[in-house]
């Protein structure tokens, strides 16, 4: 039940006489505790935090001595006590609150420092169900919310990055300011919200609930970006803690800060190369505006890069490059010849680091792993007043999934290229048409409102690339073609045949499939249907 009672206005600067510290991450704890002690602050603590402070030869009162009640049930119950929550929630200038504190022997707690049990990290490492449950913090969030509610009098720290600001105010102003306490309270509520979001989403996954009645979202700020897609837009980069190798948890070895567009494109590039098993062949993807302008496998990583670049060397300028194997010196030399924004790879050898190091603005990201294209996950898209949530497109097809629908079946080489093309198709904005030859894209048509236009654009770009390379015929001659969705009419397929394609892969499912199949037979094309669509918007 809420109270409608009004309280006296608190002073801006609140003196800190007593602080309760209870942290899982003890980074910076001792220096912080020492500074508080030096400022005359009484320290109260729990369990391992109290032991760490005592081991540093600093005076500290155990919370059990404050409450008169021992920790119990393996530490599940230690701070859930009126002497703790009363000390955090009491309105200091309210006569009734002050009388209650005196009657029950409750001392005010002016500063709370808590970071929570590492639930997110426990889940990320793949811990068993029971271990995850034991890392759900109860007392910590309760104290944090209490202190944040009473921010008029109490400061609350949930992030060691704020230790310095608090000490600076205590030593410089004699206490914490209301401005600082409000900022800390906002951060505290955001932290508990993100923590609860992680727990609720973990539970949903554990029980196979794909559409819970309530879905919580949380994340922590990784980077404040200079701007968004355009300079007039404000932007930030938040990470959710999902244990999936990629731009969110990559190590940046060099280069300028990533921009909004860099992050978006780098994610698209690395997710694409994750489609190709590094044990089978090295692969390279070159991305511009979240669309590939070249994808290839090769005998070596450098060979794959050269083949990917040949698809559309003009668009590759200023692009993002992703590799599915460690970056080596030969590949780095090739990449360094043109302007590139970002390289992302599982690792980079010494030669590659040295070569890329000469390009001071070129960003090099190392992930120590590849995203698994088969892993389940969620994809979010904002709409006015809501969010669309769908599972990650982890659909894949293999030879046994394909249905040959034409008189001629694909050759072995055509079949390999068809499967390659359909994997790439999944990562191209719809409507998508992809021409592939010998394990490399040779023409990409993306994002057109009609499928036939995408087919024509892809063929035209292949023609342009051939002319730029001084070749008489485009690489689409003798290629295969993939479509992310069915051909609604035969025109798109006929355009591909005119460009020189010899085999087609597409989902099928059009009311005019028979017409499209007949057109393929007339042109001598082999065609397989996947039964799986790969729209991407």
From Swiss-Prot:
Keywords: Hydrolase, Multifunctional enzyme, Purine biosynthesis, Transferase. Coiled coil: none annotated. It catalyses: (6R)-10-formyltetrahydrofolate + 5-amino-1-(5-phospho-beta-D-ribosyl)imidazole-4-carboxamide = 5-formamido-1-(5-phospho-D-ribosyl)imidazole-4-carboxamide + (6S)-5,6,7,8-tetrahydrofolate; IMP + H2O = 5-formamido-1-(5-phospho-D-ribosyl)imidazole-4-carboxamide. The keyword Hydrolase applies. Pathway: Purine metabolism; IMP biosynthesis via de novo pathway; 5-formamido-1-(5-phospho-D-ribosyl)imidazole-4-carboxamide from 5-amino-1-(5-phospho-D-ribosyl)imidazole-4-carboxamide (10-formyl THF route): step 1/1; Purine metabolism; IMP biosynthesis via de novo pathway; IMP from 5-formamido-1-(5-phospho-D-ribosyl)imidazole-4-carboxamide: step 1/1. GO terms for cellular component: cytosol. Its EC number is 2.1.2.3, 3.5.4.10. One of its GO terms (molecular function) is phosphoribosylaminoimidazolecarboxamide formyltransferase activity. Residues 11-158 form the MGS-like domain. GO terms for biological process: 'de novo' IMP biosynthetic process. It holds the Pfam family AICARFT_IMPCHas. The IMP cyclohydrolase activity resides in the N-terminal region. Belongs to the PurH family. NCBIfam families: PRK00881.1 (NF002049), purH (TIGR00355). This is Bifunctional purine biosynthesis protein PurH. The lineage of its organism: Bacteria, Pseudomonadati, Pseudomonadota, Alphaproteobacteria, Hyphomicrobiales.
